[in-house]
C-alpha cells in the first residue's frame, strides 16, 4: 500500500468537532509505504476517538502517529498497540503518541521500531503530554533518542529487549524524560544503550528503577544522568542472574556510571548479589547541592562500584543524609586510589559502614576541601580498607572512627587544616597500622585514640599539630609515638596510658 519513499499519510483516521469515532481493529499483514495517522482533523475537536486494537505484523515504512494536537479538548483512547513487525521512519518519530487527553492502556513491541532521522525529533517512540499504563519492549527500539517522554506519563515500562539511542549529542539518551515527563516504574532485564546518555531526566521524575536478570544500562558519557533539580526515586540493581553470555546486571559508562547533577535528588540506591556500577571516571558522582536522602546499600559477593580516574563514589558538594553501607563481600574501588571521595562543600551525615568478610574498599576514604563527615565511620566484621582515611584541606570529621571485628585499615591521616573531633578506636583482633597528624588547625585530632589491638600501631604527631583527647594502649603489641606537637589529656588526666603488655615508645 503506497509507494516507496512516500512521506504522506496512507492510512488517515480522523474526527472533528464533537464526533465520536471507534476503530475496532486495524491490523497490517502487508507493507505500508507511508504514514499511519489517527488524529483530530481540526483544532476545535471536542469528541472522542477510540482505538481498540492496532497491530502491525509486517512492514510500515513511515511514521505512526496517534494523537490529539493543538489545544483541542477531545479524547483519544487506545486500548492495545502491538507491533511484531517492523516500523521504519526515515525522519521524525517512529511511533508518536500526543495529547493531554490521549490515554494508552497497553503498548507492546516484540518487533522493530526505528527512526533513521538525524534531528532531535527522530526518536524511536515519543510520548508527549499523553498517559500510558503499560509499556513493554522485548524487541528493538532505536532513534536519536530511543524512548522520549515529553510531559507525558508512563506507569510501568518493562524492557527485556534492546532500546538504543544513536545520537552522540549531549541531549541524546536511550530513555529520556523532559518537560515534566514521568515514568513511575522501570524494570530492565534487557539492554538500554546510548552513544551519549543511557537514561536521562532533564526535567521530570523517575519513580523506581529496577535492573535485574542481566539487564544493562550503558551510556558513553553517563549510564544514568539526573539533571539539575530533578528526581530519581529508588534504584535497585540485582546481579543474581546473569545472561547466557555472562553479562552481569549493572550500569556502565566510559565516563560516569551515575550522575546526580546540581540540586538533583535520589532516595535510595541498592546494589546486591554481584551487580555492577562502573564508570571510567566515577562510579557514582554527586555534584553541588545534589542529595541522596535514603540509604546506599552495596551488598553481596561480586557487587562492585568501580571508578577510574575519579572515585568509586564521588560526592563533590552534594549531601548524603542517608546511611552508606558496604557489606557482605561488596567492593568499592577506583584505579586512582580513591574509593570514596567527599570534596568541595560535600557532607555525609548518615554514616559510613564497611562490614563483613571479603568486603573491601580498594583505595582511600578522602575528605577534602570544605567537606564534612558528621557521622561515624565503621570498619567491622572482617572488612578491609586497602588504603586509608585521609582528612585534608579544611575537611572535618566529627563522627567516631571504629575498627572492629577483625577488620583492618592501613592508615588515618589528618593534614592541611583538617580537624577530626570524634574518637578513634581499634578493637582487639583488628588492625590500624598508623595515624599521622600534621594538621595546622587549632583542634587537629581532638578526640581520644584507643588501641585495643594486638597489632603494632605507630602514631606521628607533627610539629604544631595537636592530639587533644589522650592516647590509650590496651593491646599487647607495641605502640610507637613520634610527637613534635602537643598531646592533651584523657578523662583521667593522662596524656598517654598503657594498660596492655606491649611497650609504648615515645
Where are these regions (language model features)?
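Surface-exposed loop/turn motifs in large extracellular/passenger domains
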Residues: 1-35, 39-63, 68-92, 96-196, ...
Amino acid at each position: 500500500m503506497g509507494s516507496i519513499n512516500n512521506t504522506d499519510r496512507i492510512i488517515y483516521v480522523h474526527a472533528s468537532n464533537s464526533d465520536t469515532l471507534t476503530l475496532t481493529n486495524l491490523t497490517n499483514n502487508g507493507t505500508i509505504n507511508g504514514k499511519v495517522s489517527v488524529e483530530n482533523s481540526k483544532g476545535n475537536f471536542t469528541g472522542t476517538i477510540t482505538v481498540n486494537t492496532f497491530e502491525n505484523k509486517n512492514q510500515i515504512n513511515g511514521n505512526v502517529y496517534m494523537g490529539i494536537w493543538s489545544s483541542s479538548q477531545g479524547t483519544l483512547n487506545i486500548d492495545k498497540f502491538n507491533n511484531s513487525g517492523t516500523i521504519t521512519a526515515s525522519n521524525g518519530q517512529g511511533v508518536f503518541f500526543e495529547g493531554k487527553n490521549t490515554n494508552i492502556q497497553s503498548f507492546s513491541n516484540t518487533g522493530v521500531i526505528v527512526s533513521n532521522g538525524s534531528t532531535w525529533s527522530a526518536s524511536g517512540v515519543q510520548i508527549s503530554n499523553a498517559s500510558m499504563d503499560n509499556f513493554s519492549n522485548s524487541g528493538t527500539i532505536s532513534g536519536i533518542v530511543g524512548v522520549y517522554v515529553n510531559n507525558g506519563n508512563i506507569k510501568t515500562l518493562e524492557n527485556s529487549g534492546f532500546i538504543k539511542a544513536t545520537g552522540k549529542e549531549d541531549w541524546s539518551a536511550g530513555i529520556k524524560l523532559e518537560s515534566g515527563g514521568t515514568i513511575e516504574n522501570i524494570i530492565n532485564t534487557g539492554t538500554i544503550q546510548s552513544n551519549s546518555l543511557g537514561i536521562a531526566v532533564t526535567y521530570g521524575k523517575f519513580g523506581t528503577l529496577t535492573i535485574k536478570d542481566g539487564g544493562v544500562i550503558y551510556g558513553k558519557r553517563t549510564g544514568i544522568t539526573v539533571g539539575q533539580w530533578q528526581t530519581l526515586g529508588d534504584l535497585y540493581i540485582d546481579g543474581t542472574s546473569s545472561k547466557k553470555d555472562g553479562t552481569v546486571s549493572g550500569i556502565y559508562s566510559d565516563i560516569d556510571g551515575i550522575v546526580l547533577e546540581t540540586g538533583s535528588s535520589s532516595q535510595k540506591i541498592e546494589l546486591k548479589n554481584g551487580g555492577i556500577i562502573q564508570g571510567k571516571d566515577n562510579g557514582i558522582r554527586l555534584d553541588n547541592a545534589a542529595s541522596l536522602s535514603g540509604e546506599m546499600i552495596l551488598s553481596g559477593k561480586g557487587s562492585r562500584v568501580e571508578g577510574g580516574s575519579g572515585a568509586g563514589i564521588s560526592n563533590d558538594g552534594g549531601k548524603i543524609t542517608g546511611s552508606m553501607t558496604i557489606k557482605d563481600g561488596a567492593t568499592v574501588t577506583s584505579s586512582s586510589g580513591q574509593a570514596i571521595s567527599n570534596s568541595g562543600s560535600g557532607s555525609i551525615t548518615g554514616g559510613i559502614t564497611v562490614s563483613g568478610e571479603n568486603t573491601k574498599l580498594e583505595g582511600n576514604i578522602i575528605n577534602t576541601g570544605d567537606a564534612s563527615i558528621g557521622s561515624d565511620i565503621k570498619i567491622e566484621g572482617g572488612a578491609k580498607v586497602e588504603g586509608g582515611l585521609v582528612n585534608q584541606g579544611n575537611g572535618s570529621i566529627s563522627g567516631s572512627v571504629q575498627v572492629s571485628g577483625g577488620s583492618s585499615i592501613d592508615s588515618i591521616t589528618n593534614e592541611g587544616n583538617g580537624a577530626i573531633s570524634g574518637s578513634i578506636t581499634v578493637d582487639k583482633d583488628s588492625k590500624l597500622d598508623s595515624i599521622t597528624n600534621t594538621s595546622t588547625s587549632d583542634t587537629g585530632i581532638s578526640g581520644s585514640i584507643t588501641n585495643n589491638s594486638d597489632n603494632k600501631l605507630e602514631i606521628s604527631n607533627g610539629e604544631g599539630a595537636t592530639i587533644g583527647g589522650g592516647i590509650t594502649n590496651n593491646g599487647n603489641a607495641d605502640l610507637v609515638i613520634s610527637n613534635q606537637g602537643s598531646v592533651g589529656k584523657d578523662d583521667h588526666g593522662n596524656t598517654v596510658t598503657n594498660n596492655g603488655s606491649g611497650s609504648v615508645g615515645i
